[in-house]
Amino acid sequence: MKKQKIAVLTGAGVSAESGISTFRDANGLWDNYNVEDVATLEGWNRNPALVLDFYNQRRRQLATVKPNAAHLAIASLEDNYDVTVITQNIDNLHERAGSTRIIHLHGELTKVRPENRYNERNGFSEDMVFDIGYGDINLGDTSVDGVQLRPHIVWFGEAVPKIEQAIDVVEAADILLIVGTSLQVYPAAGLYAYAKASTPIYIIDPKDVPVRDGRITHIKSVATVGMEKFIEIISKKDE
């Protein structure tokens, strides 16, 4: 029997329980920085050393945390379903939890690319993306052809090269699961609209859902607890 397809869209709420700082944390890494200075191309052009230091800190933090029960539960769905994770997060916790098919919409913290390997039409050249693990990159660290390396992150104002791939996954899904991101935040707000009319949508978020849609089941809790409830619900439907 062919496995049902589940598209899982995840945001900051999934990794928050592992201790990953988000924009909205009261005492997170972001508190000491302006978003415009460290997460835009303009900020990079003004002060690349500041941007590199910021992402070096985030990389070091990532090395100290582990996937939580929500990451592990999402990975476990692959036992019975054809699962693709679409994440807005730049950490590697889904990979470390065991998920095998992951689309990183906003890039990956543990990777870098030459700063000139990007254009609005084609995005970045995948063959020039390098995995550096949890190490630092500094001014003067270059590709083989002498170009300064930058974080492999989609900054504010930059195109999201993998959005079309994500849309295809959502359109083909039999079940759409949204965890740790609200429908007020793009691209989640835009992606959910591509689900088929017959596709049930489950949202795990402790906050109210601002959208009224008969397909939506809102599991109002944090990601770890919500994933337990979600698995319980779909297990009963499969009986």
Report the location of each language-model feature:
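Conserved catalytic core of sirtuin-type NAD+-dependent deacylases
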Residues: 1-239
